[in-house]
Swiss-Prot record:
PANTHER family, per database record: TRANSCRIPTION FACTOR (ACR-2), PUTATIVE-RELATED-RELATED, ZN(2)-C6 FUNGAL-TYPE DOMAIN-CONTAINING PROTEIN
Protein name per its UniProtKB record: Transcription factor mfmI
Location within or outside the cell: Nucleus
Main location as per UniProt: nucleus
Name of the gene this protein is made from: mfmI
Function as written in the Swiss-Prot or TrEMBL entry: Transcription factor; part of the gene cluster that mediates the biosynthesis of the phthalide-terpenoid hybrid 11'-O-desmethylfendlerol.
Record key words, sorted: Nucleus
Residue span of motif Nuclear localization signal: 24-31
Segment forming the signal sequence: none
Length: 472
């Protein structure tokens, strides 16, 4: 189980409505084209792979006083770091408000790792190449967006590095609220639609509140976002902004997992008919086996299982072949599977309920969790544990029991759950005659499992339980 845990699902989205000034356009071009059009280069000597040092990413002084080549920062996930001259170039850019350049430097630095940090499946998803530009451009003309990006990015790093968020970001937070209130008075007067960029800022406030464990505030902002979407004409008006829509739904789903509240967008999505049909089932080779294991299970649950199983097969193939799926497919599967599962109701302690919660736990690890910081969902975790305790029986196939326990371990359970989880896993591993990690992998893969997302933590859990085996 992971060591860094926070609640909720903050967003990182942006969209451009105006053209930035020439200096910023020049900066963006250099940022996006970094590493391209270099011509033939000499082969470089192999260097020892350095360990990611996130503290340097979050240190404003580094970004203004020394180039990335002098630190480990350029090795963080992406291979296209911000140019070494970022400090001097920032001094020529006119931002939407007077701010300390060092605070903006952290935002720009984070923009180079944002997708990788927030989407474990990033290497398998085809995001727009212009996303990096869309991160930067609004900083020049939208003051609310500028201040929002500053306080959300800095507080993200504070939590990631186990630092108590300080008061240095408070002025940016209050400035955002002030600007947003003034803007909503103008945009919400009925003469014009609330802009997508304004919706992005409201979503950021909701995500930040969840990050800071302020649920009431997060709910308030999400309710405001729902009103904005209704004023714009519904969720269909965001179809051209798939990335923003993904983040809206991730935040909505994350709140439901954290508190058990009903998602705010369920009624829109579940009543939208054909627009939320299940995707065509992806081809898999294990339908016969699943039909046997899930005999007597609700038909819609079995269909949901097949959709997720096929999606996992597709992602594993993409990871192996180094290809990508459209982000719209990620959005469609996430929405159609997770909102339906949350809307289903079965008897407490029933096999249907156990499978529903198992699929939700698995889906949360695929669609909601982050790469460097694992979300904590106390309500759902307790609900799943209780259902496991009530429902897991000796006549259930041990392989299915193993999958259900491991899914919880890699998605929602924490170190506090090890006391009851590890002995149970030890017993099931013995029943399945598991001796090596590859033995466990084979069983998990026969159900559904994404190595890119689950293998690292899964191996840690296996090693931990194996050590328990030796000491018993």
């Amino acid at each position: 189980m992971a060591t860094t845990q926070v609640s909720g699902m903050p967003f990182v989205v942006s969209t451009s409505l105006e053209k930035p000034d020439p200096n910023l356009r020049k900066f963006i071009r250099k940022h996006v084209m970094m590493g391209k059009n270099r011509g033939k280069t000499r082969p470089t000597k192999k260097r020892e792979k350095k360990v990611l040092d996130l503290s340097e990413v979050a240190n404003p002084a580094i970004h203004l006083t020394k180039p990335p080549a002098a630190s480990n920062v350029s090795l963080i996930v992406t291979r296209r770091p911000i140019p070494p001259r970022v400090g001097s170039e920032l001094s020529t850019v006119h931002f939407a408000d007077d701010v300390n350049l060092s605070t903006v430097a952290v935002v720009l630095r984070f923009s180079s790792i944002a997708k990788q940090a927030l989407f474990p499946l990033e290497t398998c998803i085809s995001f727009d190449k212009g996303d990096k530009k869309q991160w930067i451009e609004p900083l020049a003309f939208d003051a609310a967006y500028l201040h929002t990006m500053i306080f959300t990015t800095h507080d993200y790093f504070n939590l990631l590095l186990h630092r108590t968020p300080g008061g240095e970001t408070s002025p940016h937070f209050f400035k955002t609220i002030q600007i947003l209130r003034e803007r909503l008075v103008l945009e919400g007067n009925g003469r014009s639609k609330v802009s997508i960029l304004t919706a992005s800022v409201v979503l950021a406030l909701a995500g930040h509140a969840l990050l800071m464990n302020e649920y009431a505030s997060a709910r308030h902002h999400m309710e405001g976002l729902r009103k904005i979407i209704d004023l714009r004409g519904g969720i269909s008006t965001f179809k051209g902004s798939s990335k923003l829509l993904i983040e809206i739904l991730r935040c909505d789903l994350g709140m439901a997992f954290y508190t058990g509240s009903k998602p705010l967008f369920s009624d829109i999505l579940l009543s939208s008919g054909p627009s939320l049909l299940y995707p065509e089932p992806f081809p898999t080779s294990s339908h016969c086996k699943i039909d046997q294991l899930l005999e007597g299970i609700n038909d819609e649950l079995v269909t949901t299982w097949r959709v997720m199983e096929g999606f996992c097969s597709l992602i594993n193939l993409a990871a192996k072949s180094k290809t990508r799926i459209p982000k719209e497919m990620f959005l469609d599967v996430m929405a159609s599977v997770m909102y339906r599962l949350l809307n289903m109701e079965f008897d407490t302690g029933s096999m249907n309920e156990l499978i529903r919660l198992g699929l939700l736990a698995f889906s949360s690890s695929v669609f909601l969790q982050w790469k460097y910081m694992r979300m904590s969902y106390p309500h759902f975790s307790a609900l799943y544990e209780d259902c496991l305790m009530r429902t897991m029986v000796s006549n259930m196939p041990p392989q299915l029991q193993l999958w259900l326990l491991m899914v919880g371990a890699v998605s929602v359970f924490t170190k506090a759950d090890e006391e009851w989880l590890r002995p149970w896993l030890h017993q099931i591993m013995n029943s399945c005659e598991i001796e090596l990690w590859t033995d466990m992998q084979d069983i998990l893969d026969s159900f559904m499992w994404i190595g890119l997302v689950h293998d690292e933590l899964g191996k840690e859990i296996f090693d931990s339980v194996s050590l328990l085996t030796i000491t018993i």
